[in-house]
Regions:
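Catalytic-domain carbohydrate-binding cleft regions of carbohydrate-active enzymes
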Residues: 3-328
Length: 328
């Protein structure tokens, strides 16, 4: 690294630059691991609008798809690609409504279990993979197979994107092994999903975990799941800053903390103050009535701080996007 050029420039020269993010990614993100219904989510968005709290991204966690109603013969509902019509009776209409309210949509997926016979898109995917749909043989997840990846993206994800999904939250947690020694499935997911996400002509984006050096080319990064504690808040700025040593800048943390811990209004206020000045400001929590991140659930001082800072972040979007463009 002995050069007049700084080491980060040399790193990017060797490994590629961080790409330009779409403008909406710089706004506030709403995320919660909670079994929302379509009506509940709409009521939440309308409450945000009534309170003049601007959000640009609607994250819908894994319960958008069928989870508990999966026949045990197919396995668990951890992986899924079929809307739960009990919660979202009109998925296309729901996503169209969010778009009308100036929000982009990302859905959480855990791809490891492949495509099982109960999925709405199974017949189409099975036929493309040379499997008789009547056999109900699962289409195995195989990121090392180019044909599978083509079908996986074009025949499984594209139909959902045509309905309104803007990008995907790839919540991979199943290790680093594929049939090809040394080939990390998360790396393949990040690479192919990111490149494919521009197929409709939009600026590409994915939302996923870190797969090693070089992952900066596939933003945005998901650093969760964080514990609700002062120690977690203390660590996140350090984590974000030192990630620049490997060229990684676009981190999305669980602002406010995801799980465990105790309710602490001051902690929440300080965390949002940090989140607004972190790369991505995504409020997040687990499905617990005591750690939801709606500002009106906190005391008046904390509520005021959260609301002021969320509005501040939204006001910074033109500046952040302009600087991102110049840096790129």
């Amino acid at each position: 690294w002995s050069s007049d050029v700084c080491s980060s420039d040399l790193f990017y020269y060797l490994c590629g630059k961080q790409p330009l993010l779409p403008r909406y990614a710089f706004g506030n993100w709403w995320s919660r691991y909670h079994r929302y219904t379509e009506e509940e989510y709409k009521e939440l968005v309308e409450r945000f609008e009534d309170e003049k709290l601007p959000f640009s991204v609607a994250v819908v966690d894994m319960d958008w798809h069928i989870v508990d109603d999966v026949d045990p013969k197919y396995g668990s509902g951890w992986t899924g690609y079929t809307w739960n019509k009990n919660f979202f009776p009109d998925p296309k209409g729901f996503m169209s409504w969010l778009h009308e309210h100036n929000m982009k949509i990302t859905l959480n997926v855990h791809p490891a279990d492949g495509i099982r016979a109960y999925e709405e898109l199974y017949p189409r995917v099975a036929e493309k993979m040379g499997i008789d749909p009547e056999s109900e043989i699962a289409v195995q997840f195989d990121p090392a197979d180019p044909h599978f990846m083509e079908v996986y993206l074009k025949d499984l994800h594209h139909p959902l994107e045509e309905e309104g999904v803007d990008f995907w939250w790839l919540d991979w947690q199943q290790g680093t092994v594929t049939k090809v020694p040394g080939l990390d499935p998360l790396w393949m997911l990040n690479h192919y999903h990111y490149l494919d996400s521009s197929w409709k002509g939009n600026r590409p984006l994915t939302f996923s975990r870190y797969a090693g050096v070089g992952s900066h080319r596939y933003p945005v990064g998901f650093s969760g799941d964080s514990v609700i504690s002062w120690e977690s808040l203390q660590f996140q700025p350090y984590f974000t800053n030192t990630a620049s040593n490997v060229g990684y800048g676009w981190w999305s943390h669980d602002i406010g903390g995801h799980m465990m811990g105790i309710r602490d209004d001051e902690l929440m206020a300080r965390w949002v103050e940090y989140g607004v000045f972190s790369p991505i400001n995504r409020l997040h929590s687990t499905d617990n009535p005591f750690n939801g991140k709606e500002p009106w659930k906190f005391d008046k001082i904390t509520q005021g701080v959260m609301e002021d800072y969320l509005r501040l972040r939204h006001g910074m979007v033109p500046y952040l996007y302009t600087m991102n463009h110049r840096a790129n």
